[in-house]
Amino acid sequence: DNSKKIVSNFNDDRIKYFYSDTKLSLYDARNKAINETSGELIAFLDVDDWWDKNYIFSRASLFNDDDKDFFYCNRFTFYEKNKKLKIFRKLDLPNGKIYNYLAKDYFISISGLIIKKKIFDQVGMFNKDFNIIGDFDLVMRMAKTFNGHAINEPLLFYRDHKNNFSKKNLGMFFNEFDKWFNNQVKLGNN
């Protein structure tokens, strides 16, 4: 993709671009990138998604609030096939400890999430054993202990297309989720 070229256009020392000479799994790459960061906040943007121009600024006043540990927003789903946008959630998103909400109806997209870096010290990094549900696993671990803050406005554009990795690998998704769920039962987290 054109990530390196796009990032170089910003001419801002705070924005860093990392390239690996070896192919890494998604979650191994994310863990390595997190370890290279020097800031206090971590945000993700998958290659086929994009943010509204106000994505970061809309929550900047909240970043220093000690009662808020991670921030997430609503999203639009952009359907590549027919070029239509649809708002993901029409109901207000919950704040605070949101584990029980997520256990019933998971609604967080990794590209719509900003995390205080110190959280990784307590919940750990992405689980490299997963190829699809690593985002879900991390968010569920965070949501048990830390306070989330929702922005109901859709500031993320999630692209839905025929080449979505999770769509093309549904069997892998279900196997990973089954493994995750069985582990939760063993740990008594059901």
Where are these regions (language model features)?
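Acidic donor-binding segment of Leloir-type glycosyltransferases
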Residues: 1-19
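Acidic donor-diphosphate engagement hotspot in glycosyltransferases and nucleotidyltransferases
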Residues: 3, 30, 51-56, 81-82, ...
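Short aromatic/hydrophobic "clamp" motif used to bind/position activated sugar donors
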Residues: 42
